[in-house]
Amino acid sequence: MNPNRSLEDFLRNVINKFHRALTLRETLQVIVEEARIFLGVDRVKIYKFASDGSGEVLAEAVNRAALPSLLGLHFPVEDIPPQAREELGNQRKMIAVDVAHRRKKSHELSGRISPTEHSNGHYTTVDSCHIQYLLAMGVLSSLTVPVMQDQQLWGIMAVHHSKPRRFTEQEWETMALLSKEVSLAITQSQLSRQVHQQQVQEALVQRLETTVAQYGDRPETWQYALETVGQAVEADGAVLYIAPDLTGSVAQHYQWNLRFDWGNWLETSLWQELMRGQPSAAMEPMAAVQSTWEKPRPFTSVAPLPPTNCVPHGYTLGELEQRSDWIAPPESLSAENFQSFLIVPLAADQQWVGSLILLRKEKSLVKHWAGKRGIDRRNILPRLSFEAWEETQKLVPTWNRSERKLAQVASTQLYMAITQQFVTRLITQQTAYDPLTQLPNWIIFNRQLTLALLDALYEGKMVGVLVIAMDRFKRINESFGHKTGDGLLQEVADRLNQKLSPLAAYSPLLSRWHGDGFTILLTQISDNQEMIPLCERLLSTFQEPFFLQGQPIYLTASMGISTAPYDGETAESLLKFAEIALTRAKCQGKNTYQFYRPQDSAPMLDRLTLESDLRQALTNQEFVLYFQPQVALDTGKLLGVEALVRWQHPRLGQVAPDVFIPLAEELGLINHLGQWVLETACATHQHFFRETGRRLRMAVNISARQFQDEKWLNSVLECLKRTGMPPEDLELEITESLMMEDIKGTVVLLHRLREEGVQVAIDDFGTGYSSLSILKQLPIHRLKIDKSFVNDLLNEGADTAIIQYVIDLANGLNLETVAEGIESEAQLQRLQKMGCHLGQGYFLTRPLPAEAMMTYLYYPQILDFGPTPPLPKVALPETETEAGQGNVGDRPLPNSLNRENPWTEKLHDYVLLKERLQQRNVKEKLVLKIANKIRASLNINDILYSTVTEVRQFLNTDRVVLFKFNSQWSGQVVTESHNDFCRSIINDEIDDPCFKGHYLRLYREGRVRAVSDIEKADLADCHKELLRHYQVKANLVVPVVFNENLWGLLIAHECKTPRYWQEEDLQLLMELATQVAIAIHQGELYEQLETANIRLQQISSLDALTQVGNRYLFDSTLEREWQRLQRIREPLALLLCDVDFFKGFNDNYGHPAGDRCLKKIADAMAKVAKRPTDLVARYGGEEFAIILSETSLEGAINVTEALQVEVANLAIPHTVSGTGHVTLSIGIAVYTPERHINPNALVKAADLALYEAKAKGRNQWLAYEGSQLPHVDGEV
């Protein structure tokens, strides 16, 4: 080791370089330069192996006065024989060769001496060929260190010296750690290269999109796009072929950097076959890039990749020439020497629109070899010459994985752009239109849907497919004839187009499907919730009557919806699933819409399962209340709400009330459910009042079973008392038919309710058989007009007369009327003219969840349809004093809304999508938060913990863990976040053969697993047992994959009940998977680097033999303590110790015994100098030093005597010594540091004391203190 270069300086310089923006070659050069200076040798080089076994010197630091430079030279595979590669790669040994003595010593790459060599004096013989090889290089000492990467031998780091030299244990370990630093630098370089490749890919996609969007379908557009792709992929030439389309346009081709015209050549059968991606079975093209994107249930890839159809195929000219149908190319092709072709079909979903062909010329590769071959007999092993010579190799260039992927991405963009132009042209052709409705037909819809699927693949958005069919349209044709029916379909098409025209943001496409069916394509969809208002907008098309032969006809329609990528990934599957959802909508009463669910393909609902689930629904808190506002029709003011119960099934989603209410009555559960509704409604009423200061009438429906229960009345009164709700704010709704079952009992019960202040309304009035005389006896407040009458209100028939009669009757009895199911402005205006008091329905506002209802109470102006007064400014008080001035209910909270107000249309989106937007906001914040933590912290534990904590909080699930695989594909839970219900499973090791056999392969492919109910899922029994052991009812598993290596799994557990995982849950974890994988890899990389640096720091301050401080640590500690004690005016004591007659000990017992002796003495010193501020160091050879801070002379003498006792107790035999055992001589110096005195004065004084102690006869000590210190040249 260079005595003028401390290990600390070396370490500091190496570490600092890793924090700079250096290329891999620059980083390697820094390492070899610093290593050569530190070791004090003539050459340090880093040598990388090529795939053929040869290698190249990538970095070198050399003393040219002693050895020649080898930088950039290639060495043949024979120069490192298989035996050497075995030792370096598989056994991972570092090998030092002593050429002069023809021997070698090896250490494990960990830095430890291997046991087999320890027993053999560390050295073994070296092959004579290798000795002569090194001598020819001018090398007398060498150290070869393997560099590993991904468990493979990447290269070597070689140290050469032109003189004999021994490498110390410290140098061995230092070089082992430097090898680790090189491996980390290589990994970091690979990571940077991947990031750069991703940036290039994104930039290319952006340029292509911009070019096509800006210039459209022009030759200049395609020519520029082709040139852009060719340059990005680093091709020497390129051809873009655009096939004929359905409009009859001829094929087109564009070419870049080619001299001859490819037009006729591309029309040959061979090139048509190659361009369509259908090579002959006899040909074996280069392996294509595998890329899949499967839907998230049950497995899906972590991130969307390009479609499998646009797969590049690589060929060489030699392979093509072997084809029997090969036609010799024009002379110019041969003259330009094109030898390699990458052909990418522009195709997706079996629709081929053209091809991209990339070409590369034959390359000349110049290599400089170390030593001539063949003609120079000196190169016969052992080699005697390393004179450089130049070789020019002719290579057929290949296309690597990243270039293939880039070509695939570019081809997909070209496919989408060309297909878009095809669609544009097709739309202008009559063949693309339905002759009846003049809408695009199935040809356009299929092509546009395929294009939208590809676009969504890269945008990260959803695609929606809607199939609409008229309800009972067959009766129209039968009653009025097909000609009239055709005219009606034309009017339906016009209305649908009008409804779609404001939805340009979704790029809607309406097409005629077949019969009375239409299809609609919507793009840029974020999730299913976003589609709900769009579907309702479309269904509102049928609220106004159609007129046939002067007669108004009311039509209804049903709609089925499927979405990509979650329901399907092809046009065929999406249309199939949308039609299945349409069937479900028709089965649920028509005039509605339904989204496709996987269970739709099977029988809709398993009654036995539904019964079982319903019994648990209350316990599991699966019921929720929605609130539909009741509005005064003359003023638009909000007067009350009706509480409506909804069942949020964990697997089936929302189950319709007409399904579960009759079932609850049949199972005897309706009383419990009804009581829950009452309790929740009253409690929510009070919550609304506390938060907004507004009192509303809360209407609650009562079932027949409840009404007939003798205890029911008391339960109502107790509920009011318990919740504190004023009785006059509660309205109980009973049906007309229920009232007639026991009229006397009903009258008595209703009188009791009225006495308590509770209001009563008769629901569905007009559908039963109550008489006027009975009605007069009932103490009721309101009559509710059934929705069935309101639906036909505008026909001016019997239903209109019934409604007018009910209103007149209510007025005569001094009752209010409430109209249900108002769904159009015309209905609203007609009811206003008829004198109806109150109304509710979708036209006013749909039922709202509690949080959305709260928003409505704060801002009721958003839903008003009355006059348009100036909107008052609502200034909330800033202080409690201001808040106390006046009644809360008197605040100027506006409660009128004009439907012409620009906010009107936006509120429906707000109140219904509020929860989804909140989730999206949380999701975006979570992704940003985790990304920021990744950038802010490189601590692997922080990264892991923040990931599971934030994901569990977002998903609101019971447990989230990170599971890490080991080399045998078992593993351990390394971190977790869980609630109190779930037991902790952190550090649990899982080695389950069932898991390995059934699911490991899928996770290694990067697929996601979502299981909503493990008991009903198609899982192996052994896997179910494993999940039950961990209390799991439902789980969501995302593989953590980096650089195609599976690190582990990010797993979410639901432990109480099954859970249907929403699409956004999957999307969140899929988005996070890549971020987590990169973060973990960076954290582990940093952890490895820190470990290596800490070890370097340790060996830079510890003596390799005795493991006490070394000379460097002694010098730095002495300087530091001298400065500290100078400030506090405390003494510093120094003991210099020397083993007596140690040379004679080595000569008599041997050097290994001498090493063991020094280690025992160092251990004895550590026992007596044990304060935190004390330091024991090996000063050199058999000399040791002990620094004792804040220690007087008396204290130093005590330590000295204790040390002599400890050494005597060791009883190490020493026949040459006068005492018969090993002893120490000790020199002591004690001084209180002063600014004008150099600490070296203390060292020299202790050294003089040691010299005098030895002169007294060994095993003695002598001390100097303060003014007694002899004069030395130590003053500053």
UniProtKB/Swiss-Prot annotation:
CDD domains: EAL, GGDEF. GO terms for biological process: detection of visible light; red, far-red light phototransduction; regulation of DNA-templated transcription. A tetrapyrrole 2 binds at residue 1022. Contains two covalently linked tetrapyrrole chromophores. Residues 1-197 are annotated as: Bilin lyase domain 1. Keywords: Chromophore, Photoreceptor protein, Receptor, Repeat, Sensory transduction. Both bilin lyase domains bind with the bilin tetrapyrrole chromophore precursor. The domain 1 shows red, far-red light photoreversibility. The domain 2 is photochemically inactive. This is Phytochrome-like protein cph2. It comes from Synechocystis sp. (strain ATCC 27184 / PCC 6803 / Kazusa). The gene is cph2.
